[in-house]
C-alpha cells in the first residue's frame, strides 16, 4: 500500500531446483511450459562446489524464464561428480503435499495445450484440473474463474498451473 516501507529483500530472483538430469527437466519447463532458456553454462571445481557445501563437483546451470526477464527465473542445477555425493530426498506422496515441500506456481493462458503436452510425456499428476470461482476481488487477485492443476516434474517437484477467466 502507499507509504509502506520497502522490503529488505525481493523480488525473487530465481527458484533453484537441484535436478538429476537437466535435459529431462528442460523437456518439461522449456518444451511443454514454454519457458525460454536464458542461460545454459557449465562450471567445475572446488570453488563452486564449496559454495554449496561440497568439496568438488561439476555443475550445469540452466536459467529459464519468460523472454527478457531479469527476475522470477527457474534455475535447473545439475551436479555431477560431486564429492561427497549429493543427498537424495524421500519421494513425496503421490496424491498430496508434504511438509517442507515447495511448489512452483505458474500462471498460463495455454492450460489445455500444456495439459496435453504433459500427458503425452507421461508426467504424474497430484491433481487433475479443478475449476473454482472467486466471486469477490481482493487487493492482489481479481474475481473470476480459476483453473488449477498440479503435476510433478522429473525430480518430484510439484508444479501448479493456474489459468484465469474474468467473470
Describe each PLM feature range.
Residues 18-71, 120:
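Core segments of cupin and vicinal oxygen chelate
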Residues 3-7, 11-20, 60-81, 87-167:
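Vicinal oxygen chelate
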Residues 45-49, 84-91, 132-141, 145:
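A cross-kingdom feature marking solvent-exposed beta-strand/loop segments within repeated
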Residues 7, 53-58, 96-98, 141-143:
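A generic structural micro-feature
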Amino acid at each position: 500500500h502507499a507509504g509502506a516501507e520497502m522490503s529488505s529483500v525481493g523480488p525473487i530472483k530465481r527458484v533453484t531446483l537441484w535436478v538429476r538430469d537437466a535435459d529431462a527437466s528442460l523437456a518439461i519447463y522449456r518444451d511443454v511450459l514454454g519457458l525460454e532458456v536464458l542461460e545454459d553454462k557449465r562450471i567445475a571445481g572446488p570453488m563452486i562446489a564449496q559454495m554449496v557445501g561440497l568439496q568438488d563437483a561439476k555443475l550445469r546451470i540452466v536459467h529459464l524464464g519468460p523472454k527478457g526477464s531479469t527476475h522470477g527465473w527457474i534455475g535447473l542445477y545439475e551436479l555431477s561428480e560431486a564429492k561427497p555425493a549429493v543427498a537424495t530426498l524421500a519421494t513425496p506422496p503421490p496424491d498430496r503435499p508434504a511438509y517442507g515441500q515447495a511448489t512452483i506456481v505458474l500462471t498460463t493462458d495455454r492450460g489445455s495445450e500444456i495439459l496435453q503436452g504433459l500427458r503425452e510425456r507421461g508426467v504424474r499428476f497430484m491433481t487433475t484440473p479443478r475449476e473454482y470461482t472467486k466471486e469477490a476481488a481482493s487487493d492482489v487477485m481479481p474475481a473470476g474463474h480459476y483453473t488449477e492443476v498440479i503435476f510433478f516434474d522429473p525430480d518430484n517437484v510439484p508444479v501448479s498451473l493456474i489459468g484465469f477467466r474474468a467473470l
